[in-house]
Every structure is written in structure tokens, then in C-alpha cells.
Amino acid sequence: QSFGNQWARGHFM
């Protein structure tokens, strides 16, 4: 799991 992925989900989505 990548922490960057969760961050992107909240910023891009």
C-alpha cells in the first residue's frame, strides 16, 4: 500500500 495513493484519492477525487 502506498500512502501517496491515499493522499491522491482525497486530492484528485
From Swiss-Prot:
Species: Bombina variegata
GO cellular component, one term: extracellular region
Name of the protein in its database record: Bombesin-like peptide 2
Residues with the Methionine amide modification: 13
Gene Ontology MF annotations: hormone activity
GO BP, sorted A to Z: defense response; neuropeptide signaling pathway; regulation of insulin secretion
The UniProt record lists the keyword tRNA-binding: no
InterPro entries according to UniProt: Bombesin (IPR000874)
